[in-house]
Amino acid sequence: MELFKDIKNLGKLVRLERIFNRESEKTVIVPMDHGVSNGPIKGLIDIRKTVNDVAEGGANAVLLHKGIVRHGHRGYGKDVGLIIHLSGGTAISPNPLKKVIVTTVEEAIRMGADAVSIHVNVGSDEDWEAYRDLGMIAETCEYWGMPLIAMMYPRGKHIQNERDPELVAHAARLGAELGADIVKTSYTGDIDSFRDVVKGCPAPVVVAGGPKTNTDEEFLQMIKDAMEAGAAGVAVGRNIFQHDDVVGITRAVCKIVHENADVEEALKEIRKK
């Protein structure tokens, strides 16, 4: 794929084609790692059903913690890529922004992963530990031919606006600088500023879904704008798995990401009954 022309590692290229659409060269990832940070929230109670629904809706990959893979594995129907999340931290911790490494690239390989991901809160206390982890894991991923997704967010007690374009651009660039193959980060709120984020990051950028939005139109417009700005895809959790029509909203997102549909056209996928 042209998107990954700078990657020469065959193992990475083979795996990346399992989580990206070969024709559009874009991806729709549904993270479901929230159980560690927030517990059994709505949409993640019956993990197998949710995985089934997003797969039927056309998602390219799901992102899970290692212990949930056995409970969410489909074993039938349409295939969906598997991304194992390496980081963990809880909302009830004295330091909820602290993320530690909870598994290895090697274990992810044994579980059949197509990629691994790591979470970095740029600007948080002791964030340097996460930078070290990212750099070392990037080296391991290169050795094994495993694609690495870095979730890079400006977060910390000194960060007043987590969507500040300069901070988001810095966080995204940091992920690429330390070896990530793909960077996931927050949408900055408008096309022009997010385009600058994409331009400043040598690695492909996928946009995070963020908090649950008030309307489908608001959510899908954000996806549309991010794609217009040059995003390589989306990584959306709550706005998909907490939707009343998980299959439909997944189809709507895929319609925009892979077919360049407008919001009104994508909304029709939700209204199908």
From Swiss-Prot:
<comment type="subunit">
    <text>Homodecamer.</text>
</comment>
<feature type="active site" description="Schiff-base intermediate with substrate">
    <location>
        <position position="184"/>
    </location>
</feature>
<dbReference type="InterPro" id="IPR050456">
    <property type="entry name" value="DeoC/FbaB_aldolase"/>
</dbReference>
<keyword id="KW-0808">Transferase</keyword>
<dbReference type="GO" id="GO:0016836">
    <property type="term" value="F:hydro-lyase activity"/>
</dbReference>
<comment type="function">
    <text>Catalyzes a transaldol reaction between 6-deoxy-5-ketofructose 1-phosphate (DKFP) and L-aspartate semialdehyde (ASA) with an elimination of hydroxypyruvaldehyde phosphate to yield 2-amino-3,7-dideoxy-D-threo-hept-6-ulosonate (ADH). Plays a key role in an alternative pathway of the biosynthesis of 3-dehydroquinate (DHQ), which is involved in the canonical pathway for the biosynthesis of aromatic amino acids. Can also catalyze the cleavage of fructose-1,6-bisphosphate (FBP) to glyceraldehyde-3-phosphate (GAP) and dihydroxyacetone phosphate (DHAP).</text>
</comment>
<comment type="similarity">
    <text>Belongs to the DeoC/FbaB aldolase family. ADHS subfamily.</text>
</comment>
<feature type="active site" description="Proton donor">
    <location>
        <position position="153"/>
    </location>
</feature>
<dbReference type="InterPro" id="IPR013785">
    <property type="entry name" value="Aldolase_TIM"/>
</dbReference>
<protein>
    <recommendedName>
        <fullName>2-amino-3,7-dideoxy-D-threo-hept-6-ulosonate synthase</fullName>
        <ecNumber>2.2.1.10</ecNumber>
    </recommendedName>
</protein>
<dbReference type="GO" id="GO:0016744">
    <property type="term" value="F:transketolase or transaldolase activity"/>
</dbReference>
<keyword id="KW-0704">Schiff base</keyword>
<feature type="active site" description="Proton acceptor">
    <location>
        <position position="33"/>
    </location>
</feature>
<dbReference type="GO" id="GO:0009073">
    <property type="term" value="P:aromatic amino acid family biosynthetic process"/>
</dbReference>
<dbReference type="InterPro" id="IPR002915">
    <property type="entry name" value="DeoC/FbaB/LacD_aldolase"/>
</dbReference>
<feature type="binding site">
    <location>
        <begin position="33"/>
        <end position="37"/>
    </location>
    <ligand>
        <name>1-deoxy-D-threo-hexo-2,5-diulose 6-phosphate</name>
    </ligand>
</feature>
<dbReference type="GO" id="GO:0008652">
    <property type="term" value="P:amino acid biosynthetic process"/>
</dbReference>
<keyword id="KW-0057">Aromatic amino acid biosynthesis</keyword>
<keyword id="KW-0028">Amino-acid biosynthesis</keyword>
<dbReference type="GO" id="GO:0004332">
    <property type="term" value="F:fructose-bisphosphate aldolase activity"/>
</dbReference>
<dbReference type="InterPro" id="IPR041720">
    <property type="entry name" value="FbaB-like"/>
</dbReference>
<feature type="binding site">
    <location>
        <begin position="209"/>
        <end position="210"/>
    </location>
    <ligand>
        <name>1-deoxy-D-threo-hexo-2,5-diulose 6-phosphate</name>
    </ligand>
</feature>
<feature type="binding site">
    <location>
        <begin position="153"/>
        <end position="155"/>
    </location>
    <ligand>
        <name>1-deoxy-D-threo-hexo-2,5-diulose 6-phosphate</name>
    </ligand>
</feature>
<dbReference type="Pfam" id="PF01791">
    <property type="entry name" value="DeoC"/>
</dbReference>
<dbReference type="GO" id="GO:0016747">
    <property type="term" value="F:acyltransferase activity, transferring groups other than amino-acyl groups"/>
</dbReference>
<feature type="binding site">
    <location>
        <begin position="237"/>
        <end position="238"/>
    </location>
    <ligand>
        <name>1-deoxy-D-threo-hexo-2,5-diulose 6-phosphate</name>
    </ligand>
</feature>
<dbReference type="InterPro" id="IPR010210">
    <property type="entry name" value="ADH_synthase"/>
</dbReference>
